[in-house]
């Protein structure tokens, strides 16, 4: 040990540069360290304290690496041992000389004085108020942060620091075979390059193990193997961990149940056999192995402190979460993902979500090009192409590619619906389906189309909608070649070819191809008409029909024919009209082969073959083919004449009668005879007139060419 070191003062660090005159002044450990008072130390959070600890250790390693032979400060000594940095006289006697710890050549007489040296050194640091406060705080902090780490792996008594970068820099210090700085950490990673073996480093660690009274035959043998491979790590006594240095694979096996885990963290969480449960709940007395489990339990007890949303009644624990959720009701949703259109209230959530798009997907499907994060996801996806269905339902024989889908399907047979909506009482077999359903009540639409701004509850609905902008129709019918934007539309279309109508009305037995059509039909029996026109008070069972009806009052006709310019209020009327120009008649009668361009005219014609008249007047018993004819007939019993002429005030029970009457005032005569040129204002008079030209006139006048039907 250098003779000029005064133990009664702060340890002055004299390096070899000072001895050979290459350095101008000495540097003390105090000159390069950061000092805190007790008040300042208490204001640091755990992350800042951890940073302080790492900086102190790194500074000390740099000083030692460039050749400064200094006494190891007490707090650094405790940090190197990875133990709680306490300062007690009982423990000081067990500490070893720091010079021998790092392999320095120390005379035998110096070793005999190591106990008094340590005592004097620690006393000096204890008298320093700031160091004393930090030591106590480090001890408390170590109790909290190192408890789980010590259970997982038991570090060696000392760690050695050799900074390869520092030692290789240009300086007057001469070091042979410099090693790499290695810290004894549980998460020590394997080196990419094989470092050179440092003889000084190896011998110092062997000597350090001997001085500390550890098992020489075991630890020294392990050290030879470690240093020979260029690595340093400590072995845990509680579990056997095998690590492949070159591949980085780690297999940890527990002692109790022999379960094999892929990572130490997984084994640590699995070791519930002998693990202590230090975290206890003050409310119910339950104990937990992890603090996160304790916090989750405490949230259950703090239900009384929840902040409830006044709009929808949803409750939140932190006030911040409630304020963020309230923006969903106000419509303030500024963060939209440009990749998939998903909406977020907070920008931080958007940034986290965007990582899913930028994340590497190495497993790619060769059939469709879709990529996945995991190989297992790719295997599941490939079953959709091969149509492989390994899991079959024992009840109905239906096959599925995944076991989870089979389990969900089997709930249909058992009738199990354990997830019920608190708003309407509707029950579901899956929790995810319930979550989607609850968005109907809350009005939450998280997926927005970036093209038109339309929002959707489910991502699948957004994907189907976006195809309307791109024109993509990936689902094609193999029978007729027609394409659709969604698989559900293709399945419904297939029923036209198969004639399948799986949805049957329980009241009248009528069947339908779609469930939505059945729901609309059932409103006829229940008389349910929720949608009422604000202008005339007429009620409808569908909102779409109400919207078309309101166009009568507004005069809006958005569908205009490009051929003749005629406009229509509904799209179905517009399509039917276009068939007049194209000559298309898709509805063909199977009885007589007659074709029609509209569905309504086709149904009217079919009744002529069946003679079916389902609409019967309850007053006189007269039956009609169409419901509109029955309504018109019933006006004769009630005396109702809703159609009034604005010119003369005359009223009529039928709208065609009003149109014929109005031609009297306008003088319009649209029906002209091609034989004689006579014109008429209604079709019935025109038809009667034409019989005068087509009738047989066998009785002729002998005086003229005029003929008569009767003699």
Swiss-Prot record:
Which segments show compositional bias classed as Polar residues?
1-11
Decide whether keyword Translocase is in the record: no
| Induction line | By HIV-1 infection.
Note down the stretches annotated as region Disordered: 1-21
GO biological process, alphabetically ordered: defense response to virus; negative regulation of transcription by RNA polymerase II; positive regulation of transcription by RNA polymerase II
**Endpoints of the signal sequence:** none
User: Where is it chiefly localized?
Assistant: cytoplasm
Outline the extent of the KRAB domain. 27-98
| Organs and tissues of expression | Ubiquitous.
Q: Where is it localised?
A: Cytoplasm; Nucleus
List, alphabetically, the GO terms of the cellular component aspect: cytosol; nucleolus
Write out the residue ranges of the motif Nuclear localization signal. Answer: 359-362
Entry's Gene Ontology molecular function annotations: DNA-binding transcription activator activity, RNA polymerase II-specific; DNA-binding transcription factor activity; DNA-binding transcription repressor activity, RNA polymerase II-specific; RNA polymerase II transcription regulatory region sequence-specific DNA binding; zinc ion binding
Q: Which domain of life is it from?
A: Eukaryota
Give the SMART domains listed for this entry. KRAB, ZnF_C2H2
Keywords (alphabetical) are: Antiviral defense, Cytoplasm, DNA-binding, Metal-binding, Nucleus, Repeat, Repressor, Transcription, Transcription regulation, Zinc, Zinc-finger
Does the keyword Transferase feature in the UniProt annotation? no
Please give the InterPro entries that the UniProt record associates with this protein: KRAB, KRAB_dom_sf, Znf_C2H2_sf, Znf_C2H2_type
Q: Point out which parts of the chain are C2H2-type zinc fingers, as ranges.
A: 279-301, 307-329, 335-357, 363-385, 391-413, 419-441, 447-469, 475-497, 503-525, 531-553, 559-581, 587-609, 615-637, 643-665, 671-693
Briefly state the protein's biological role.
Answer: Down-regulates the expression of several chemokine receptors. Interferes with HIV-1 replication by suppressing Tat-induced viral LTR promoter activity.
Q: What is the similarity comment for this entry?
A: Belongs to the krueppel C2H2-type zinc-finger protein family.
Q: What is the name of this protein?
A: Zinc finger protein 175
Q: Tell me the organism's taxonomic lineage.
A: Eukaryota, Metazoa, Chordata, Craniata, Vertebrata
């Amino acid at each position: 040990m250098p003779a000029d070191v005064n133990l009664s003062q702060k340890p002055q660090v004299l390096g070899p540069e000072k001895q050979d005159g290459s350095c101008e002044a000495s540097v003390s450990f105090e000159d390069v360290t950061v000092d805190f008072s007790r008040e300042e130390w208490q204001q640091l959070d755990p992350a800042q304290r951890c940073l302080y600890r790492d900086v102190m250790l790194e500074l000390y390693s740099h000083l030692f690496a460039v050749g400064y032979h200094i006494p190891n400060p007490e707090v650094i000594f405790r940090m190197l041992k990875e133990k709680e940095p306490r300062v007690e006289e009982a423990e000081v006697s067990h500490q070893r000389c720091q010079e021998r710890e790092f392999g320095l050549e120390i005379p035998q007489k110096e070793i005999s004085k190591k106990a008094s040296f340590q005592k004097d050194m620690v006393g000096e640091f204890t008298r320093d108020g700031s160091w004393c406060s930090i030591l106590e705080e480090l001890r408390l902090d170590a109790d909290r942060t190192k408890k789980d780490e010590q259970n997982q792996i038991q570090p060696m008594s000392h760690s050695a620091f050799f900074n390869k970068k520092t030692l290789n820099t240009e300086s007057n210090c001469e070091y042979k075979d410099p090693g790499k700085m290695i810290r004894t950490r549980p998460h020590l990673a394997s080196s990419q390059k094989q470092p050179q073996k440092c003889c000084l480093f190896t011998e110092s660690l062997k000597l350090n193990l001997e001085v500390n009274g550890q098992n020489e035959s075991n630890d020294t043998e392990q050290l030879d193997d470690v240093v020979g491979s260029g690595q340093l790590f400590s072995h845990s006594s509680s579990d056997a961990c095998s690590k492949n240095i070159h591949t980085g694979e780690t297999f940890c096996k527990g002692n109790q149940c022999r379960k094999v885990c892929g990572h130490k963290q997984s084994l640590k969480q699995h070791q519930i056999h002998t693990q202590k449960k230090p975290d206890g709940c003050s409310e119910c007395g339950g104990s937990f192995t992890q603090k996160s489990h304790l916090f989750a339990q405490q949230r259950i007890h703090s239900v009384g402190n929840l902040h409830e949303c006044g709009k929808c009644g949803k409750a939140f624990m932190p006030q911040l979460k409630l304020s963020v959720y309230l923006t969903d009701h106000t419509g303030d949703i500024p963060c939209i993902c440009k990749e998939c259109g998903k909406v977020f209230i907070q920008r931080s959530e958007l940034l986290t979500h965007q990582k899913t798009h930028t994340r590497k997907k190495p497993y790619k499907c060769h059939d469709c090009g879709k990529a996945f994060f995991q190989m297992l996801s790719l295997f599941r996806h490939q079953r959709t192409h091969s149509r492989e269905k390994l899991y079959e339902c024992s009840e109905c024989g239906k096959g599925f590619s995944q076991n989870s889908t089979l389990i969900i399907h089997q709930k249909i047979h058992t009738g199990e619906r354990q997830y019920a909506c608190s708003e309407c009482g509707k029950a579901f077999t899956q929790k995810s389906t319930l979550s989607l359903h609850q968005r109907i009540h809350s009005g939450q639409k998280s997926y927005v189309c970036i093209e038109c701004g339309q929002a959707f509850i489910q991502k699948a609905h957004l994907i189907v909608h976006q195809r309307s902008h791109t024109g993509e129709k990936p689902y094609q019918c193999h029978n007729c070649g027609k394409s659709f934007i969604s698989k559900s539309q293709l399945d419904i279309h297939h029923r036209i070819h198969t004639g399948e109508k799986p949805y049957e009305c329980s009241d009248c037995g009528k069947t339908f191809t779609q469930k939505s059509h059945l729901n609309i039909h059932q409103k006829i029996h229940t008389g349910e008409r929720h949608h009422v026109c604000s202008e005339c008070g007429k009620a409808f069972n569908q909102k779409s029909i109400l919207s078309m009806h309101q166009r009568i009052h507004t005069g809006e006709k958005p569908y205009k024919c490009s051929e003749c310019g005629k406009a229509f209020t509904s799209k179905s009327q517009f399509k039917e009209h276009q068939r007049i120009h194209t000559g298309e008649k898709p509805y063909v009668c199977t009885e007589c082969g007659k074709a029609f361009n509209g569905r309504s005219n086709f149904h009217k014609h079919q009744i002529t073959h069946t003679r079916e008249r389902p609409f019967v007047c309850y007053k006189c018993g007269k039956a009609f083919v169409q419901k509109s004819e029955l309504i018109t007939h019933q006006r004769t019993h009630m005396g109702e004449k809703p159609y009034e002429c604005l010119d003369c005030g005359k009223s009529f029970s039928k709208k065609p009668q009003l149109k014929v009457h109005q031609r009297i005032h306008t003088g319009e005569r649209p029906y002209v005879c091609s034989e004689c040129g006579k014109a008429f204002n209604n079709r019935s008079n025109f038809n009667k007139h034409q019989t005068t030209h087509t009738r047989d006139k066998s009785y002729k006048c002998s005086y003229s060419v005029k003929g008569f039907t009767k003699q």
